[in-house]
UniProtKB/Swiss-Prot annotation:
Belongs to the amidase family. GatA subfamily. Heterotrimer of A, B and C subunits. One of its GO terms (molecular function) is ATP binding. The gene is gatA. Transmembrane segments: none annotated. Keywords: ATP-binding, Ligase, Nucleotide-binding, Protein biosynthesis. One of its GO terms (biological process) is translation. PROSITE patterns: AMIDASES. The active site is at residues 77, 152, 176. GO terms for cellular component: glutamyl-tRNA(Gln) amidotransferase complex. It catalyses: L-glutamyl-tRNA(Gln) + L-glutamine + ATP + H2O = L-glutaminyl-tRNA(Gln) + L-glutamate + ADP + phosphate + H(+). Allows the formation of correctly charged Gln-tRNA(Gln) through the transamidation of misacylated Glu-tRNA(Gln) in organisms which lack glutaminyl-tRNA synthetase. The reaction takes place in the presence of glutamine and ATP through an activated gamma-phospho-Glu-tRNA(Gln). This is Glutamyl-tRNA(Gln) amidotransferase subunit A. Its EC number is 6.3.5.7.
Amino acid sequence: MTFNNKTIEELHNLLVSKEISATELTQATLENIKSREEALNSFVTIAEEQALVQAKAIDEAGIDADNVLSGIPLAVKDNISTDGILTTAASKMLYNYEPIFDATAVANAKTKGMIVVGKTNMDEFAMGGSGETSHYGATKNAWDHSKVPGGSSSGSAAAVASGQVRLSLGSDTGGSIRQPAAFNGIVGLKPTYGTVSRFGLIAFGSSLDQIGPFAPTVKENALLLNAIASEDAKDSTSAPVRIADFTSKIGQDIKGMKIALPKEYLGEGIDPEVKETILNAAKHFEKLGAIVEEVSLPHSKYGVAVYYIIASSEASSNLQRFDGIRYGYRAEDATNLDEIYVNSRSQGFGEEVKRRIMLGTFSLSSGYYDAYYKKAGQVRTLIIQDFEKVFADYDLILGPTAPSVAYDLDSLNHDPVAMYLADLLTIPVNLAGLPGISIPAGFSQGLPVGLQLIGPKHSEETIYQVAAAFEATTGYHKQQPVIFGGDN
């Protein structure tokens, strides 16, 4: 059996009743990964040996009947540290980096008995929105292999959508969980900033980065967030966990809930079929008893410009350490210290990473700091205030996750600005540190359309409640790409 059509709770029951063992489930998952890998390129490293050792230990200790994730396989994005498993951030710069520790999110998952089966492909150093900037080649969309899977958590999304794994971890700096979740028709959540520790995450934009879960359904997504969320002394920005169980409101009705629909999220640049899908979703929420009203987020149009100044500035600082001396790939053709620095970084980083380092260095440079970085910080505050005004009167915000469905591979690589605009609707959530989820809401041109729900800080359980209500009464999550297959 492949088990890829079984939910986490169904797998848990099979494990507890000993109809299958953790080792058998892990072996089946590894076969699922290998059989689809040539078509998708969603993994950088398949950790077969380590996964089977973990599974054997769990079988010997016995499945924890009270812990639904005990013995469940997990794929981890390649910028999240895993003890003894290559963690390259999909870059030549870190081609041979093998951490000697687990990121806190991974350690938390392992404590719950989860088994790390591999590291997923991604845009290099999480910089990119298409899954194409990886040193190890582009990941393909699970629904159409000629389309991008979204990014930067491309492999994590494609792996879940295709049935390679049931659960995976990604990171989200400007939409890197939600956009690939939308393009692949699965559920992806970017938690409130600080909910999941960043310790062990290879830094891109430290004021924006957040680790989060991918899953085929809302409840399974919440179960994984339960496992990884924690306050952590190793991350000074981590927050106390305010919600004991993120699934606590799933199944409750949403009558009387007020949902805002920003007019800016359905304006210029939004594909007409995507817009129609979201408007239909808004009507569906009204049928479920929610009140949906149009609002304005006037400064959201500046989000992309603000983000690319702030994120690139933070990246230029964070990536200084990769110089061939302290960390990272060292060029062999260097004859002096200056050449080691220049050649190692020139050869070790890809084009998109170098583009963002240069933009960030420029934004922070003397004479330009006030005009760019400082100004971006001021506009970021205005974006935050826009959200606060809306959340004073509304429970959640509704909109599309991305302006379009997945586009052709290699179609935007020569137009960075056009690719950056694909994150237009997800970026403001990171700038404000808010939680946001993408769930399947329909199809356009045979490709999934993602619906985004945004809440005030620490409102994940409400987001899950509303997302689950939509999921339960629509069924879009039940539609699967051809590559998914079914139980044998």
